Amino acid sequence: MVKETIIVSRPITGIAADLATAPDDAFAGRMMGDGAVVTPTAATIVAPEDGQVIFVFDTKHAIGFLTDSGLSMLLHIGIDTVNLEGKGFTCFVENGQSVKKGDKLLEIDIDYLTANAPSLCSPILCTELEDNQKVRLLAEGEVKAGDPLFAVDVYEEEA
């Protein structure tokens, strides 16, 4: 039985899909966590919820995030974008910074990334789910940043 549901919002305007569709086996196989993918159609990446930026990769392609509700997240922009060494990304936050839902985290150069990365498909993951927490996708297709993307249902633990 579900005792709590945590809603996670979209950090990106774009096309949302099930994580299994990610063109990378580690993400598609949920080896790094569970969530969804969004292929950006707009350049701004925002905080999905109130929380704290835990880390920004030196290459600016990924941000570790802890929501105020306790979810550890990874916002990974594009596939193999680590190889671009930060080109195509402008970062507006730093490690340890507190942010509110909708605050700008990154800006991306969609044209540059499209030309230089294998895919813009961006995994949005919960990286440290408990056994009693399950992700449920809430939206597929065209989505707008700030609207619900997926839910994390917290189930009552069996005695």
Residue map of PLM features:
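Contiguous, well-folded functional domains in the mature portion of proteins
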Residues: M1-A159
